[in-house]
Amino acid sequence: MLSVQNLEVVYQDVILVLRGVSFEIPKGKIVSLLGSNGSGKTTVIRSITGLLDIQNGDITKGTISVDGEDITNFNPSKIVEKGIAQVLEGRRIFSELTVVENLRLGGHTNSQDIQSNIEKVLDMFPILKQRSKGEAGYLSGGEQQMLAIGRALMSDPSYLLLDEPSLGLAPKLVDQIADLIKEINEQGVTVLLVEQNANMALNVSDHGYIMETGNIVMDNPSEVLLKDEDVREFYLGLNPEGTKRKSFKDVKHYKRKKRWLS
């Protein structure tokens, strides 16, 4: 299990971004983390994978543990060794390198199995296999996202953290990515899916958490969230005709769960 407990994060020594965030990702499950821009989703992932330094961020309170071991403030390479891999928002592939070269870079912590893992990833993504010797920058957006996911899988992770994998993709490609996430999970990889596309995320995941302004404001099994009136209105755009969309801050009739310690 990957567990985040009472996490607080501050940027630039003054900006409190996460305010006591707590959630769990049971082994073998897909958990979605939903929220609008600025809610703190990406900061959560950066905290787990040790990338807060990029934005001068610090964990000031709370713990992150994987399978019972505290990994709070571990460096990124050590976290990868613990079986955690991240796919960054916006794909972030090396466009001037070939598909195979991108994959090879993802396997540097598992060098003994690089070639066999490359073959395994290319078998999973036939379109990448066809273009394995071509420069990654010439791939389509969907193909680049597949490459980014494949590169993360090169380290044989137990936990895969996906940051906005549907961003900028056409609906048909979003469906393909959703099917791919399910396939990866069926192979034994536990998944944290960070998304603004609530419909896709909740249809893929087992459990969902909703963030606003650095807090977890709601969590439930995904099938329950899909039927929740407030989730349907605010995240799925299914509000009654002619009414204004509201913030969860203004919602009074659902039960918020306080997820941080007093």
Where on the chain are the PLM-derived regions?
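Glycine-rich phosphate-binding loops of nucleotide-dependent enzymes
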Residues: 2-262
